[in-house]
Design a protein with these regions (language model features):
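Carbohydrate-active catalytic/glycan-binding domains of CAZyme proteins
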Residues: 1-103
Length: 103
């Protein structure tokens, strides 16, 4: 089972300490982290049935709240990341977005 855990170190190379218990369900991978105000959001791919993109949030890196139900992602979204852009660029990108197609 793949689950996300957290560990601490003074160097990116370790040594590691304070390894957490898993803070996601089973069978997740591809995490991406974004800071939004005082909160940190960790997005991940849940790749067994039902497949979906999930997320948890934390402010202290010790406790995590599952916020998957509060978010929406495009169908079949996998292994993404978050990039900060200006509101102007967001408007321009949305204006150029193609119409959805059915499968």
């Amino acid at each position: 089972m793949k689950r996300l855990r957290l560990a601490f170190a003074d160097s990116p190379r370790g040594p590691w300490r304070d390894v957490s218990e898993p803070f996601t369900g089973d069978w997740v991978e591809g995490p991406s982290v974004a800071r939004i105000g005082p909160e940190w959001l960790i997005y991940f791919d849940h790749y067994t049935q039902p497949q979906h993109y999930g997320a948890v949030r934390t402010t202290d890196w010790r406790t995590f709240e599952d916020i998957t139900a509060q978010l929406s992602f495009p169908a079949d979204h996998r292994h993404g990341t978050v990039v900060k852009i200006s509101e102007e660029l967001a408007r321009r990108l949305q204006a150029r977005r193609p119409a959805p197609t059915s499968r």
